[in-house]
UniProtKB/Swiss-Prot annotation:
Phosphoserine PTM positions: 94
InterPro entries found in the cross-reference section: PFA-DSPs, Prot-tyrosine_phosphatase-like, Siw14-like, Tyr_Pase_AS, TYR_PHOSPHATASE_DUAL_dom
List of residues binding 1D-myo-inositol hexakisphosphate: 189-190, 193
EC number(s) on file: 3.6.1.52
Protein name: Inositol diphosphatase SIW14
UniProt organism field: Saccharomyces cerevisiae (strain ATCC 204508 / S288c) (Baker's yeast)
Top-rank taxon, per record: Eukaryota
Location of region: Disordered: 1-20
pH dependence remark: Optimum pH is 6.
Subcellular compartments: Cytoplasm
Amino acid sequence: MGLYQAKNDEGSDPKSSSKIDDLIENEAEIIRLIKEDGKLLIDNGDGRDIHNIIQEDKLLSVEFNEVLKRFHGEEKSDIPRKEFDEDEDDGYDSNEHHQKTIEVMNTLNHVINKEVIPPENFSHVVGEIYRSSFPRQENFSFLHERLKLKSILVLIPEEYPQENLNFLKLTGIKLYQVGMSGNKEPFVNIPSHLLTKALEIVLNPANQPILIHCNRGKHRTGCLIGCIRKLQNWSLTMIFDEYRRFAFPKARALDQQFIEMYDDDEIKRIASKNNWLPLQW
């Protein structure tokens, strides 16, 4: 996302509130950038940003916070955001993974067949392509006996758990790993070439049935599925609706922007060459 810039008229006072008033009234997105990142720069040659100017003018600061309440229903926080921290939904936690398995196994009714326990956020995508959150031990029978997977594509950069590797070795399921970080501000984005590489793996019928997963099956998986839907000629409205349903309550605007802006020319060329399209339901 580019930085917004407000240019003062020649000779105008950079502390004047009229320019900011205009921005406040007309640009909700700019207000969001100011609130979260302090990135609305004043191009007057002194390198100061809007935050500095507002802090120097107490009256303007009070007025500005009142406007923030209108847009966000809360006061502007002075606590700086940790910009590069992993979202809890993105980072794989082996202890959490193991603990959830214990909890599920302890509460299962023994009458229930393990074959019917899919991973969280599981869904059929198209053909023999599936999506889910990170599979755990209680899901292994479902993946092998019900889905009869040939491959798993994992989209996290962390090392794959040993118990999962043992399961794959035992069943002959092939593991593909295309590690990527999630789309998070300010400048952490999924590289397009990694998405293309992942799509090439998924679309290849030789790898199907295939399961796609990240940690929670929301963001990185959602971006990949969104790009598959583009190849199916879905409308953006339908694509974003599906993305938001799986990402709820943490849908990311940057993920949806990535899906919209992703250049699929290369994967279309590869898919056409190998007769992978159109995808069959």
